[in-house]
């Protein structure tokens, strides 16, 4: 069973194509990657993301497998009306589905909006580290500074005219790549809880 399109059943990360607006984490969190990577139990079921890739997603523009954006749909309907279904299926596997550069203008507008952003560093506080069924992730506490991120996210959503359904802000630390044996589920919970105790109320900077 494959749990996520981003990882295979051997714990190796696969190519996964799309466009996303992210905020990179500036802190060195290599110890988290190592904790998962070298933990005898966690490493049997989870593949850690490289600490250099840790980030918070601000807005998901589009990725393989998601419904097409209006820009992509309109291009297909105008240029390939009789191949619509076939191309929609093709978009789920094809690298970057941008036929005729149909979403370039949208990407430029989003990029411009991001460049106009004036906030400097944003400091967030960790609420908890938890296992949500497919990933180990960090959730953040509600601070007034999140209003800046929410406002930016709303502007990006308005430009795309598409709600991405992302949910709450989080940092993904690793993905599950195989089923957890029943006798080790409690051990997994304990090992994740150790990480939770180490990180709760710690801060990091975007």
Predicted segments with their positions:
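Histidine-dependent nucleotide/RNA phosphoesterase domain, centered on the 2H-phosphoesterase fold
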Residues: 1-206
